[in-house]
Design a protein with these regions (language model features):
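Acidic/proline-rich low-complexity IDRs
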Residues: 2-5, 9, 506, 642, ...
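Glycoside hydrolase catalytic-domain context in secreted enzymes
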Residues: 17-719, 726-742
Length: 754
């Protein structure tokens, strides 16, 4: 329809004149593809009425904003979809619209993508998602998310890219580029400091400028400056007592000022709270379900959004000029020319085999082998006769639920079905025992899994059955962890505990005692407590990996694919091993009595740990976590050796290149990720013991070796100087630390910056 409208406008403009020159002369500048985009925007703005300007900067339905029919600008459609295109919902309700062609491929959640440590996977991800979005008529995907993993309790960590700003920065850029190469806008979220789900509308974050710039902003900055994202979504929370959907510091000063961002700022849904701030503090497009109650009961609630009729009225009353409005309109029109008005937009594809293949490849590269005692994995398909699968997460669909990322998929292969299919090829019997009962529901906004997971047996009977079957199995594979229920890996709330729910610890210990070939596969987007780690032979982090979940997990467990994922966050033993909980500042302190139930109440959360997030904190406190940041095993072995640099001294405007040799010393093909961290030997400010500043994944056949080089500039040596409000690289001695995990950096090379 959008292409049809544009074609009609172009055709009408070209009908009357017979001469090509006359046609060109009569074609409006805003439709003339030979003219610079900014000139076309100027012309369009000059033709638009006040009402037409207003209509394109606020929602007209749950996920769309209006175009300008008179000028041929079509409506603009957004959709949730960090890891799949969300099913269509009703115009003014969250229930699904009942479409028959809005199923999709569910790609792995972004924690899994980050765990691949492979920017190429990000590019593949973005391109495939863009094609799915195009087929569905979507112009903007509301993602990716790059909020930092500050606490493992955050219910939305599964949507993000881990704890390290450098890793997130590298991984987010190709995702954006891949998505936007298809003419679909990214909308990087949630800018910024949205690191909790609990009280997300009310939390005011108090953070040092240094931590803000070194930890919480770099991935957004990379998305803007390197990824060239066309959209940024503001966050629900407050910073300096202003909501981040209209914040003078984060939006006007940093994003649009310091970073020269030329795209649109979209409110999170219902994230606008004030007319004057919405007008003056950087918000460009307002979306949502409500606006502090103003829209309830109206004939057309969307007309009561702050950037709708209230804005028009304020302009007419002289409270605002059209200066701010024209900047918003300019940005939205620029977005239109990049998407809906882009004549070179390709065609979309839905649920294609190439998309399923991409989902599976990303999943296989992101699955992390955490522990493999006595080489219990891969399953020996030549000797095994019977494999027991245990756990609700072996059968439960994980694509439905979890909040706005919930999907309606064409197919989702369960871990149990994936293993049955794969092991059946070798004549291996696969048995199943439930083991525990967790969340038996399967409905989100009208999308249902169709599963009946009811099981009324007692905990004791469920465990007894699993243990009895485990005693005679060659292997026992348990799929446990979290799910997409409230207070687990789900939007809107945080987890209440670090421990596994549903008494899974008890089941795990019993199974480990019953069978020495016991493997625990953790399905989650978060770390969990593992008090039984020493008793378990194998541990795999399986994430939420979407449509091809069963296929990918079966490939890893049987050795058809060699695991190469690395953790994108530090897996702590307990909450007290994270700065947020060690300082006891999470979730914050309420300003008034009554907590969340008191209208207008704000909860202040101070990030007292500052820059010491994740491995930076465990290094500082000399804590040995359950599993380190960057940790991940393989079925083969690698030797990283011969670290050297192309110089011993580096100029402020220069670079230095570090090279190592990586050799596959094992018996099967595999991939290793070389990680480079920088240690500042002596600084004028307190600095982390080390910081990730480079990595590269390399694929090697048995016996094969390659040299891997990583080049850094002074940016990798810099810290944010609060006194001058700028980045600073101090002359002096540094060390490059190289290895394959934050706790396994055996190579060291000294150099100097002068």
């Amino acid at each position: 329809m959008k292409q049809f409208i544009l074609s009609c406008v172009l055709s009408v403009a070209a009908i009357a004149p017979s001469q090509a020159q006359q046609t060109t002369r009569q074609l409006p500048v805003y439709l003339d593809q030979t003219k610079p985009v900014e000139q076309r925007i100027d012309d369009a703005i000059s033709r638009m009425t006040l009402a037409e300007k207003i209509r394109i900067i606020h929602a007209q339905s749950k996920f769309s904003s209006a175009g300008v029919p008179r000028l041929g600008f079509p409506d603009f459609w957004t959709d949730d979809g960090p890891h799949g295109v969300r099913p269509d919902v009703l115009w003014d309700e969250w229930e699904q619209a009942g479409q028959t062609n809005d199923s999709c491929v569910a790609f792995p959640a972004l924690t899994c993508l980050a765990a691949s440590w492979n920017p190429q996977m990000s590019r593949i991800y973005g391109e495939a998602l863009g094609e799915e979005a195009l087929y569905r008529g979507k112009d903007m995907i509301l993602g990716p998310g790059v909020n930092i993993y500050r606490t493992p309790l955050n219910g939305r960590n599964f949507e993000y890219m881990g704890e390290d700003p450098f890793l997130a920065s590298i991984m987010v850029v190709p995702y954006i580029q891949g998505l936007q190469s298809k003419g679909v806008s990214a909308c990087v979220k949630h800018y910024c400091l949205n690191n909790d789900e609990e009280y997300r509308h009310q939390v005011n974050v108090i953070v040092s400028d240094r931590a803000l710039h070194e930890i919480y902003l770099p991935a957004f900055k990379a998305a803007v400056e390197k990824g060239k994202t066309w959209g940024i979504m503001g966050a629900y929370n407050l910073y300096k007592n202003e909501h981040n959907c209209h914040n003078q510091w984060t939006l006007n000063k940093i994003l649009k000022g310091d970073w020269k961002y030329d795209g649109v700022v979209v409110s999170d849904w219902g994230g606008a709270h004030d007319l004057e701030q919405s007008v003056k503090n950087g918000l460009d497009m307002e979306f949502g379900t409500w606006t502090d109650g103003l829209t309830m009961g109206a004939t057309n609630a969307y007309d009561n959004y702050y950037l709708s009729m209230p804005y028009i009225k304020a302009i007419q009353e002289g409270k605002f000029t059209q200066k701010e409005l024209d900047d918003k309109v300019r940005r939205v029109l620029r977005l239109f020319y990049r998407t809906t008005m882009n004549p070179n937009r390709p065609h979309g594809f839905l649920c294609s085999e190439s998309h399923y293949a991409a989902a599976r490849q990303i999943a296989e590269e992101g699955i992390v082998l955490l522990q493999n005692r006595n080489n219990v994995l891969p399953i020996n398909t030549q000797k095994a006769k019977r494999v027991l699968v245990v756990g609700e997460n072996a059968i439960k669909m994980m694509t439905v639920g979890g909040g706005s990322s919930s999907l309606k998929v064409q197919r989702e292969i369960s871990p149990l079905d994936g293993l049955k299919t794969r092991l059946g090829k070798d004549g291996i019997e696969v048995d199943y025992a439930r083991g525990y009962v967790g969340d038996v529901t399967g409905n989100y906004n009208g999308v249902t899994t169709g599963q009946n997971l009811e099981d009324k047996r007692s905990e004791a009977k469920l465990i007894a059955e699993a243990v009895e079957k485990a005693k005679t199995a060659d292997y026992v594979i348990m799929f446990g962890g979290l799910n997409k229920s409230d207070f687990q890996d789900c939007e809107g709330h945080d987890r209440k505990h670090y421990e596994l729910p549903y008494h899974q610890d008890k089941l795990i210990e019993a199974l480990a005692k019953a069978n020495r070939n016991f493997v625990y596969v953790n399905i989650s987007g978060n770390a969990v407590a593992m008090p039984w780690k020493a008793k378990v032979a194998g541990i795999v982090q399986g994430w939420f990996i979407g449509s091809e979940s069963g296929e990918a997990l079966a490939s890893i467990l049987t050795g058809d694919a060699n695991p190469s994922g690395k953790l994108p966050f530090t897996w702590v033993n307990s909450l007290k091993e994270t700065g947020a909980h060690a300082h006891n500042t999470y979730p914050g302190t309420w300003r008034q009595k009554g907590g969340a139930s008191t209208k207008g109440n704000i909860i202040d959360e101070e990030y007292k740990e500052g820059i010491y997030v994740g491995y930076r904190w465990t290094d500082k406190e000399r804590i040995k976590p359950t599993f380190a940041f960057g940790h991940g095993l393989s079925y083969t072995q690698f030797a990283i050796s011969n670290l050297r640099s192309d110089k011993m001294q580096m100029k402020q405007d220069g670079t230095i290149t570090f090279t190592v040799n990586v050799k596959n010393t094992g018996k099967c093909a595999g991939a290793e990720t070389v990680q480079l961290y920088i240690h500042d030997v002596k600084a004028s400010v307190d600095r982390p013991q080390k910081e990730l500043k480079g990595f590269q994944k390399v694929y090697l056949q048995p016996g094969e070796s390659k040299d891997i080089s990583i080049t850094i500039s002074k940016e990798a040596l810099s810290f944010y100087d609060e006194a001058s409000s700028s980045w600073k690289a101090e002359a002096g001695k540094f060390e490059a630390l190289v290895g394959n995990a934050a706790d396994n950096l055996k190579l060291k090379k000294a150099f100097e910056l002068f």
